[in-house]
Amino acid sequence: DTGMIADVGTWFDIKDLYTDAVVDIKENSTILPGLIDMHVHIGFYDRRLDANAIRHNLGHKTLIAYKNMQDALSVGITTLRSVAEPEGLGSAIRAGLHKGYIKGPRYFTCERGIAITGGHGTRHDEKVQDTVIEADGEWEVRKAVRQNLKDGADWIKVLASHREHYCEYTLEELQAAVDEVHRFNKKCCIHAATRQAIESAVISGFDTIEHGAFL
């Protein structure tokens, strides 16, 4: 009745507990809980042939995000965490779900990612710098965290590496990000795909590491 899993066990363990429940299962089928995808970019559009036309149009990005939500739900994914989206998209999608305007998986947003100036995820054209906040130094990083929380972020995403073998953020900057996030009782994830970035992420206390090559 509550939409939650009531019990787990073999058929012989629980069959007498729910004698009035009717479940129609096709022959040779299996029931499993909803799947969880903790790393998506629900409004991602860069690899589309019409990316340049979409880049300046939040409406198009929103429609792409909605289609991706439906696709996820159709294959059994019932929870999504979106790790960096165009500004305003994540909180808008979440609000639409909560208000019943749209249907889709449970949804948690990081809003925009946080990156160094010119770092991973940034663009040369500032007019379309829509998926990250560029922040340098401990206090700029803290301010970027606060801005994302103001915009409605459930999680905070920091980007600390690209493809070179170093960490783009200093350890002090990463520690400032984690401290600020945890001070507000939120959790943070980090894009870390090099050894140095991963080591700094662990030392700093990030809650999850994204990609984690070489682990």
Predicted regions and their residues:
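Histidine-rich, glycine-flanked metal-binding segment
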Residues: 1-32
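Metal-associated gating/positioning segment near the N- to mid-region
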Residues: 30-96, 203-204
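Metal-cofactor-binding active-site regions of metalloenzymes
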Residues: 42-54, 85, 101-130
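Active-site core of metal-dependent hydrolases
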Residues: 159-215
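Divalent metal-dependent hydrolysis catalytic cores, especially in the metallo-beta-lactamase
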Residues: 64-90, 104-113, 153-163, 187, ...
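Divalent metal-coordination and catalytic microenvironments
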Residues: 3, 28, 36-39, 76, ...
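Active-site mouth loops of central-metabolism enzymes
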Residues: 50-64, 123-143, 187
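Short, acidic/polar
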Residues: 61-71, 134-149, 192-199
